[in-house]
Amino acid sequence: MKYTGSIFKRSRRLGFSLLENNKEFSKGKKRKTIPGQHGNRFRSSTMSGYAQQLQEKQRMQYMYGITDKQFRRLFRLVLKQRGNLAVNLFRVLESRLDNIVYRMGFAPTRRSARQLVNHGHVLLNDRTVDTPSIILNPGDKVRLKAKTIKIPIVKAASESGVVSPFVETNNKTFEGTYVRFPERSELPAGINESYVVEWYKRLVK
């Protein structure tokens, strides 16, 4: 509950559902405004360019559950790639192993997907791995171990049937394939990735 509470608080502060399901803003929650005495006034005020970049960076960082150090390392990787920098940044984040486990519907949140990987419940191309930050390529195969299938949150997540279009899964065997890189239209719409790019362009050389 401690982690869930912090996610709800961060989501309200950033005005964005980090869980991608708007649970943080559901009617059952006591607070729907930005935490703090002046939450509503802050939200309505005009933000500076710096503040907008910081907010978008935090939205993306907290949604994928990575540290600023990890973000900078990923950004350096993206700088070497061809194509649209902002789209490539999103694609690299989406290609992380913990995110793919989440996108395949094997875990209810990225955090729980990351824990599954950390504790050795996940096989990548038939090899047990414990590094959530591994970057996958299209064609890579992910599978959960037999004992993992019995974990309640794994069963519940799989039964929800929420699977992204750029992966293929088999809910009976709990295995899936990363079919292709996602299109921008298939990714979270509430983030302006161009602000994130501008933020890290100043910091990463």
Swiss-Prot record:
Gene3D superfamilies: Ribosomal Protein S4 Delta 41, Chain A, domain 1, RNA-binding S4 domain. One of its GO terms (molecular function) is rRNA binding. GO terms for biological process: ribosomal small subunit biogenesis; translation. Keywords: Ribonucleoprotein, Ribosomal protein, RNA-binding, rRNA-binding. Signal peptide: none annotated. Residues 95-156 form the S4 RNA-binding domain. It holds the Pfam family Ribosomal_S4. Coiled coil: none annotated. The keyword RNA-binding applies. Belongs to the universal ribosomal protein uS4 family. PANTHER family: 30S 40S RIBOSOMAL PROTEIN, SMALL RIBOSOMAL SUBUNIT PROTEIN US4M. Part of the 30S ribosomal subunit. Contacts protein S5. The interaction surface between S4 and S5 is involved in control of translational fidelity. This is Small ribosomal subunit protein uS4. It comes from Mycoplasma pneumoniae (strain ATCC 29342 / M129 / Subtype 1) (Mycoplasmoides pneumoniae). The gene is rpsD.
